[in-house]
Amino acid sequence: MNDIKVMNHAADNIRILAASMVEKANSGHPGGAMGGSDFINVLFSEYLVYDPADPTWTGRDRFFLDPGHMSPMLYAGLALRGFFSMEDLKQFRQWGSVTPGHPELDLQRGIENSSGPLGQGHALAAGAAVAEKFLEARLGSTMMQHKIYAYISDGAVEEEISQGVGRIAGNLGLNNLIMFYDSNDIQLSTECGVVMNEDTEMKYKAWGWNVIKINGNDVAQIREALDAAQKEQDRPTLIIGKTVMGKGALRADGTSYEACINTHGAPLGGNAYVNTIKHLGGDPENAFVIFDDVKEIYAKRAEELKKIVAERKAAEAEWRKANPEKAAQMDEWFSGKAPKVDWSKVEQKAGSATRAASAACLGVLAEQVPNMICASADLSNSDKTDGFLKKTKSIVRGDFSGAFFQAGVAELTMADMCIGMMLHGGVVAAMGTFFVFSDYMKPAVRIAALMQVPVKFIWTHDAFRVGEDGPTHEPVEQEAQIRLMEKLKNHAGKDSVRVFRPADADETTVCWKLAMENVETPTALIFSRQGIAKLPEGTDYEQAAKGAYIVAGSDENPDVILVASGSEVSTLEAGCEALRADGIKVRVVSAPSEGLFRGQSKEYQESVLPKNAKIFGMTAGLPVTLQGLVGANGKVWGMESFGFSAPYKVLDEKLGYTGENVYKQVKAFLAEA
């Protein structure tokens, strides 16, 4: 172990760099970063196992930061490890820099997750811990023996998601999860005591955690806590570190600026900054430096890591020789490539609900994709993720040989944990719940989209046809909301989320195939509760890969084009016979993914939905859901209000989702044109 005086000097070095980054940017959060520097320094210089020459090594420990506003602490700590230059730190929060205001996923620089929205970061970490246990059950402890470290703040503990993470991690006994709670009792607007009065230690103990309380600015106590956490065999560990906001900060008049709300979210400023840097042993005129003795302890750690990693990789090489098939499988799992699936094994029943069709696909995936985890928020028998569950078993405490993750009623926690599983690597994760409850998951959808994590969202009971449960459970605006993510580009220029709403059972198979092949972005799959009539014989379902396509039986040179997704396609088909009896030529278009369709050539788009054509759309969501497809001269029949409680066939009649009303509305539309 390093001399404590040098360790304290290193922590002060991180504080100086963190405060200076914020000062130079004239923007950011110095206080928390200064308070947490001791833990970060101890973890990075003495405990975290990683390969400096191979940042993506699968056997590395992983560190997940939850409070992204403490990025100056992370960047400064990573700079001591050699991942960032002083120039990088000087460009904090500037255009084009590698040090954005909140950390963004960058494995080559040691950043395991994007963070910012409080609470999500430690949920990602808990998911990564599940993935490590899952893979250890399949590959053994030689290949999977690392720890998952998480760093949380008072704000994360206040966020509702901490309840889900605390419950699930404790229930599963994730002893590979070590979480540091930076408890400084200060937040942006108030002292924490104004808004929270609870015994956090007892709360986590009640969830089954090993809880250790320490002085979070004391090197010896941090070491002792980490030693105990690493030895824990049965429980996740929460280290509650009582830290000092703005540790070492001085005001302009030289008095203490510690434990003050003002240091949370603003630069120290002027003479307060100058006094603070001097007090910590730095030079305000040349603050962006790493002290020589600090360089030494991190150079020493780098040498230690060379030996540790060499031993680990030698053991891994021996394992590979002894287990060539498993080694090849592991490489495939961590490759980021789409898994190989024989989709011909999927057997669909005509007329089934698309949630049931999804279950058929999930059953095949459970058999053919051994590194896939499927989850549900206490709805597996309704969202039909039980199609997967029936071919495996649930993950439980002490036995991670199953592949089904029972999250309980915790949609946001489930989503973030599944994303964390994929961030860990080696795992494909999917999760299910009712579409209306996607509202609980939007923050996770967004962070997955931002990080380009190809997780699969399974949302069933897609419209008012939920029926008797009534408007609280009947999605209306949800499809329009999620399809907005098809229009939003990620930083790689791709649609940030791929969305599918298939029209029948066979189209469901194709949509699942496309979802599994999508390794660039999250995918949302939206399925019906009720049975849906099969599309006309001869429909080329593979055309669904283009996002929208012409359904078999459509007329040449149509007078009108009818377009929809999901179950409304069959409703449009039901109105075609009467329209054709009146001599009207009709084309029906199924559009499971507008985003994919807009990615096709202009020629293809024009061949399916010509600009000057008369286009009528039907959606069980808001009319705006289809507005982009029907165009300015088109017409959409959609929901103008929340749904109602009644049998779904009654609602079809009352709300106009029948073949008869399609005929009536299209005739009126053509008469207007």
Task: List the predicted regions and their residue ranges.
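Conserved beta-strand elements of the Class I
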Residues: 149, 373, 561-563
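Conserved residues at beta->alpha junctions
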Residues: 152, 213-216, 409, 502-503, ...
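Short acidic, Gly/Ser-rich segments with clustered Asp/Glu that frequently serve as metal-coordination loops
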Residues: 155-161
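Non-catalytic, alpha-helical, charged scaffold/linker segments
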Residues: 277-308
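Residue-level marker for buried hydrophobic side chains located in beta-strands
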Residues: 150-151, 179, 375, 616
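Thiamine diphosphate
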Residues: 1-147, 296, 300-526, 531-533, ...
